[in-house]
């Protein structure tokens, strides 16, 4: 189905990522942005309500007919699950309790992780910090696809399969690109998560567990919100490494669409990123942007010039400070 993508390698660049320099320039001109670098304590209540909502949903779906279970799993469960992964993204930046209470944030991330079904929050934090420090870094940034992904998923049909299988690739990619020794916190995350899964299964049954696990997988695969995976850093326009999205799904995703703003100011919680854009509008308005994640997914699949190889990549030099 369709032609193969034209790219046969990543877009190798020999310059540093643009975010550090732009951050310095904006802060020199607008030092008031520093006042936005503070915890968002509303995250605590929002995430707690999301966990409670999923617990109620587990109970409500436990006796549903399978066709209705599948319907509600995709329509409701997948949306909440994907939204929760982006809440965990916020928590990984210590946005819930602040940098002075890092362990509180790690524990809260494990709590937010519970309705996802698979241990995720602690490992995500470790790799995500590398992504910010070394964006596009060869052998470090696991957000960059492997060479196999770029080589194999090169036709529209294969790219569609690749999007559906995003949860799988985000799971195995770190093991191929930048494996890290497992930590005590990751073991705790795993034990807590699987204990919770067992509790759900024994108290509410297999359908509740299905809703939890399959909802997470579907939400991170072929789903409108999953457009952000492609929109954030895939090079739709040559020379542009990061892109923002300013559409309505930001309300469900803690403003993850404000991605240029986020990489420029990772200490600013999602709720304040629109203020960053407003204050420094002359820096962000000229940058390429999206208004539809669904269109991003469609264009990525159908455009023969785009593939998993459509990422800017750089060799890293000097001593690396890895998580």
UniProtKB/Swiss-Prot annotation:
Motif placement: Histidine box-1: 89-93
GO cellular component, one term: endoplasmic reticulum membrane
Subcellular localization: Endoplasmic reticulum membrane
Membrane topology: Multi-pass membrane protein
UniProt-listed Pfam families: FA_desaturase, Lipid_DES
GO MF terms held by the record: cis-trans isomerase activity; retinol isomerase activity; sphingolipid delta-4 desaturase activity
Transmembrane intervals: 41-61, 68-88, 104-124, 152-172, 185-205, 210-230
Motif (Histidine box-3): 259-263
Tagged with keyword Isomerase: yes
Key words of the record: Endoplasmic reticulum, Fatty acid biosynthesis, Fatty acid metabolism, Isomerase, Lipid biosynthesis, Lipid metabolism, Membrane, Oxidoreductase, Transmembrane, Transmembrane helix
Protein known as: Sphingolipid delta(4)-desaturase DES1
Organism, as annotated: Xenopus tropicalis
Lineage: Eukaryota, Metazoa, Chordata, Craniata, Vertebrata
Gene of this entry: degs1
